């Protein structure tokens, strides 16, 4: 890796660390901007993934028990693509192992929605990994002939992709997808190994950022997926502001907000607000 690239990565880490915990989502957007500027990615998607099934049940599941808990895209995707993703990967279980959760993995159209890449990603769970669409980690010639590739790549003009997966724990992973779109004319410029190495260095060294991001969105075993309101309340709590002030800013009754705070504490397995805040300091 070139010395100039290393210095850019160091500066990015400093910039990410400068964001307070309450502005972790802004740090995510900043990181996505960086990938777009320095690696010419047309879109960046962040996924929080959670292992929901025990070992025995996971053996019979096409995703080996892993489920998408949260998904954020840097650019607004086509409505048809958003509906396609939601039709299969929506987090309707909200942390509960409902019948719909189990049926999802056994639906007749599972192979259409769960492509070769996704299956390989979950098979390798537990290690930091980086892959390019055409670097040989999957049989690309076979992959591009699948219905999954047509629906999820060709119809959405995704010409190339990098997968970067950070294992925060044995049951939680932070996943970044960097996409390049098919240009209007000419051939697409595929990601190089050097570009993938730069992206990997950025994310492999940002351990604290991954953990803050995952916690903010409730991507932890036993924690239900947080609603948008709960996420905003949590962001307010992380600023250190009084609950009354947070309630006013969110248009909530203080007593109602107090109930939300208690619920958040319970979901994160703590009993007080200071203990909840300590999670972001690595003290719990």
Question: What function would you assign to each model-found segment?
Answer:
Residues 230-237, 276:
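Short alpha-helical "packing" element that flanks the helix-turn-helix/winged-helix DNA-binding module
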Residues 200, 235, 248, 278:
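A cross-family signal for key residues in well-ordered alpha-helices
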Residues 240-275:
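Recognition helix of helix-turn-helix DNA-binding domains
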Residues 4, 11-21, 29-172, 178-183, ...:
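Regulatory input/activation interfaces that engage signals or partners
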Residues 187-208:
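Amphipathic alpha-helical "output/dimerization" segments
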Residues 211-232:
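Regulatory hinge/linker segments at domain boundaries
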Residues 237-241, 282:
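Short helix-capping/turn signature of helix-turn-helix
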Residues 277-284:
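Intrinsically disordered, low-complexity basic tails/linkers immediately adjacent to helix-turn-helix/homeobox/MYB/SANT
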């Amino acid at each position: 890796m070139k010395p100039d690239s290393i210095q850019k990565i160091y500066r990015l880490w400093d910039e990410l660390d400068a964001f307070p915990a309450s502005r972790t989502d802004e740090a995510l957007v900043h990181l996505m901007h960086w990938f777009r500027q320095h690696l010419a990615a047309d879109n960046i998607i962040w996924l929080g993934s959670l292992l929901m099934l025990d070992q025995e049940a996971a053996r019979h599941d096409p995703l080996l028990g892993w489920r998408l808990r949260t998904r954020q895209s840097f650019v607004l995707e086509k409505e048809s693509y958003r509906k396609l993703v939601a039709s299969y990967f929506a987090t309707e279980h909200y942390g509960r192992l409902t019948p719909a959760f189990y049926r999802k993995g056994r639906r007749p159209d599972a192979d259409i929605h769960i492509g070769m890449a996704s299956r390989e990603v979950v098979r390798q769970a537990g290690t930091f990994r980086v892959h390019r669409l055409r670097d040989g980690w999957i049989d690309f010639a076979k992959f591009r002939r699948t219905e999954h590739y047509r629906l999820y790549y060709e119809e959405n003009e995704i010409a190339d992709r990098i997968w970067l997966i950070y294992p925060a724990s044995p049951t939680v992973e932070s996943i970044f997808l960097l996409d390049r779109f098919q240009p209007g004319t000419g051939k697409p410029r595929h990601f190089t190994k050097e570009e993938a190495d730069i992206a990997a260095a950025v994310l492999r060294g940002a351990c604290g950022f991954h953990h803050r991001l995952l916690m903010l969105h409730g991507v932890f075993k036993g924690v239900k997926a947080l609603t948008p309101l709960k996420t905003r309340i949590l962001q307010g709590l992380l600023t250190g502001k009084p609950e009354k002030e947070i309630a006013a800013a969110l248009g909530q009754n203080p007593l109602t907000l107090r109930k939300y705070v208690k619920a958040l504490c319970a979901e994160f397995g703590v009993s007080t607000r200071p203990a909840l805040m300590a999670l972001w300091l690595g003290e719990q």
